[in-house]
Amino acid sequence: MIETPSLAEFYHQQLFADCVPFWFPRAVDEIHGGFLHCFDLDGSLVDDDKSVWAQGRISWMLLTIYQDHERRPEWLTWAESGLKFLTEKCVDFSDGRMFFQVLRDGTPLRKRRYAYSESFAAIAFAAHAAATGSEDSATKARHWFKKFTEWNFLPNNAPPKFTGARPLEALGPRMITLVTAQELELRLGKSADLTHWIDRCIHEIRTLFVKSDLQVVMENVAPDGSISDHFDGRTLNPGHAIEGS
């Protein structure tokens, strides 16, 4: 068994001697801003389309290691390039939501019926607010979190993907709302709204999705928490079970 200090050193080395040097500055798009993220093992670029999720998550990661590890100016500069790209290129101003995928220059390519780009933008702006003291970024973080929760939880906001013949509730929105609210609380401080969402999501995950008798966390359940005995209802995602814990 590897001792805990050895594990800490192992992961530290993997992150800062392997992962970060592979991605940066390779991923930074010096031409259009934001980040490229489709690379082969040898570092060659295999696709230059940009996931909007990735723009938020990469910006968040850079700002997190900037605050928690070392304040390298380039990490902040690169993260701010990602935030600028998100703000200027990734928002559909017809409804205020974000796109899912754009071309390298930011031309919109695809938009999903669900909203997750917004949640990753929220944590990125919250991290920037904490790193720089920017009230504008704090406001944007709260704005995108509100957009995300409204789209996922208010009735009739998202276009239906199924008929009402077999209604299901999904773990995904609760899982991401929980971790997003926790991250905003960490970086921006506690608030009644964030506490509400954290408590609600923990309660719903525990009461609807966790099946202690089966030792599983379901991905989709009936509205009353019962298991739907069909492919969608039997789906398990161990990664989501860990993430929701």
What are these regions (language model features)?
Residues M1-S245:
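Glycan-recognition and catalytic cores of secretory/periplasmic carbohydrate-active enzymes
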